[in-house]
Amino acid sequence: MTQNLERLQRQIGYQFNQPALLKQALTHRSAAVKHNERLEFLGDAILNFIIAEALYHQFPKCNEGELSRMRATLVREPTLASLARQFELGDYLSLGPGELKSGGFRRESILADCVEAIIGAISLDSDLATTTKIVQHWYQAQLKQIQPGDNQKDPKTRLQEYLQGKRLPLPTYNVVEIKGEAHCQTFTVECYVKNIDRTFMGSGASRRKAEQAAAEKILQLLEMK
């Protein structure tokens, strides 16, 4: 484990003074009493601040709404899970038997939460300036690529605005299935749009994420027309 953590620390670009903090950040609540949820809470707040400050300086002419949408894009689950895969965090996670069996080391929500927990752990092990430097390095490519615009809006918002612009009825969303235990549920939602006369399905770790997935499928169809 020590050798593995040394490798991980090289990958994330930070050497812990208190390795126990890193170990805790990698521990899912299904595996132990001392898990990473409190670190995740802290890391989420710090990440939002770091990204908000970076965007504030990078886009001096953008308004609050544009900055908020760009920040949401950069701190959302898929972006964090992508970082986790770059660091191969799935190889280091401590999971309970149930999560191991269900492939929790690949689940985006668990990977994203772990990235936030590591940020929280780094902040406790060092200081805000050091944490900011590390996180900005992780986000170097994303911060260079991101631009304000409609593409920063989430799929549900974009779909609603598209339909409103054409004076069409808004979509309806219904949960059709919930699988798994309370701490690792998967929601399946159907979305119906009257003028298309088709039902689209989406799945996710929450109802909101499932609705977003379904809306994204409809948008892909509309953009092909």
Swiss-Prot record:
Q: Which CDD domains match?
A: DSRM_RNAse_III_family, RIBOc
Compartment annotation: Cytoplasm
Gene Ontology CC annotations of this record: cytoplasm
Q: What class of enzyme is it?
A: hydrolase
Identify which residues the record assigns to the active site: 44, 116
Pfam families xref list: dsrm (PF00035), Ribonucleas_3_3 (PF14622)
Record's keyword terms, sorted: Cytoplasm, Endonuclease, Hydrolase, Magnesium, Metal-binding, mRNA processing, Nuclease, RNA-binding, rRNA processing, rRNA-binding, tRNA processing
Binding, Mg(2+): 40, 113, 116
Where primarily located? cytoplasm
Q: Which residues form the DRBM domain?
A: 154-224
Q: What is its EC number?
A: 3.1.26.3
**InterPro entries reported in the protein's UniProt record:** dsRBD_dom, RNase_III, RNase_III_dom, RNase_III_sf
Give all residue intervals belonging to the RNase III domain. Answer: 5-127
Q: How does it assemble?
A: Homodimer.
PANTHER family documented for this protein? RIBONUCLEASE 3, RIBONUCLEASE III
Q: Which family does it belong to?
A: Belongs to the ribonuclease III family.
Described by its record, this protein's role is as follows: Digests double-stranded RNA. Involved in the processing of primary rRNA transcript to yield the immediate precursors to the large and small rRNAs (23S and 16S). Also processes some mRNAs, and tRNAs when they are encoded in the rRNA operon.
Name used for this protein in its record: Ribonuclease 3
Identify the gene encoding this protein: rnc
